[in-house]
């Protein structure tokens, strides 16, 4: 056993405009090559697009989308006696939120080319808030995998 104490988790800081941690987590995942101002610009344009299309508070649409994509369980590969089993494990809320953000951004990046990232992200978030879209499909796939491998839950 290590004698070193575990490091305390840092709470995510909130962004300057919406004063929301979730927005900042999203910006940090959009971020590429250290261009944070570009990441902020992409997200704020996406939020403005959501505001125009839905005429709702974009922050509530974002929260609803992330809540819809957040998985409860996932599978983890576990090697037991020479064979690998997909073992279902429960996910903590912070980890689930991080997965939801990653899946939403991945789904929006995979949308057909021709439009900018802000446009793709806004449409992916609006779809996720309406319970459809590729990110929601990914969550359902993870839940299906966990359900199919429920017999191996005791390998946890």
From Swiss-Prot:
Alphabetic keyword roster: Chloroplast, Plastid, Ribonucleoprotein, Ribosomal protein, RNA-binding, rRNA-binding
Span of the signal peptide: none
GO biological process, one term: translation
Domain of life: Eukaryota
Subunit annotation: Part of the 30S ribosomal subunit.
Task of the protein: One of the primary rRNA binding proteins, it binds directly to 16S rRNA where it nucleates assembly of the head domain of the 30S subunit.
Family of the protein in this entry: Belongs to the universal ribosomal protein uS7 family.
Name of the protein in its database record: Small ribosomal subunit protein uS7c
Organism from which the protein derives: Bowenia serrulata
């Amino acid at each position: 056993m290590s004698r070193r104490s575990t490091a305390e988790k840092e709470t995510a800081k909130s962004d300057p405009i919406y004063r929301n941690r979730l927005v900042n987590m999203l910006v940090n995942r959009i971020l590429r090559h250290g261009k944070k101002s570009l990441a902020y610009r992409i997200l704020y344009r996406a939020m403005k697009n959501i505001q125009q299309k839905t005429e709702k508070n974009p922050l509530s649409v974002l929260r609803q989308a992330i809540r819809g994509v957040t998985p409860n369980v996932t599978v983890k590969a576990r090697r037991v006696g020479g064979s690998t089993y997909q073992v279902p494990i429960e996910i903590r809320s912070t980890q689930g939120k991080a997965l939801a953000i990653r899946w939403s951004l991945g789904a929006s990046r995979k949308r057909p080319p021709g439009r900018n990232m802000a446009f793709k992200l806004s449409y992916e978030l609006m779809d996720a808030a309406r319970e459809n879209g590729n990110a929601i499909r990914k969550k359902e796939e993870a839940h299906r995998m966990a359900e199919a491998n429920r017999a191996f839950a005791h390998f946890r």
